[in-house]
């Protein structure tokens, strides 16, 4: 059996749990939130969290789809957490973010595919963080344009 080739040092990613990383993790965990960073096993998580930022993932941590490019768990999701929109907004305030990024799992199990939850989350972020810009990485809502207007109205 051939010897295993080791990765060069420049290719290795240092998670480097500095104070900002630890504080970001504490805020996310204490608000029972999910991030695509951890769910998707992002190799840049240490860098982003180390700078005090994270991409929030709403709608739970179980996706109804099984995309080949994503590491998020798939299956039958839990019911939506009605407190999640407020928890996301509070976390953004605690992290003092000027710009927040929010994505979600696909929720094909819900009649509105999660559009109402998106709208509620955006409204809560704006209410508690009026100066923060929000980047939303929304699902495709199965091409149902009317649902896009629901989330866009927020």
Which residues make up each language-model segment?
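Flexible, acidic/Gly-rich N-terminal and inter-domain linker regions that tether
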Residues: 1-66
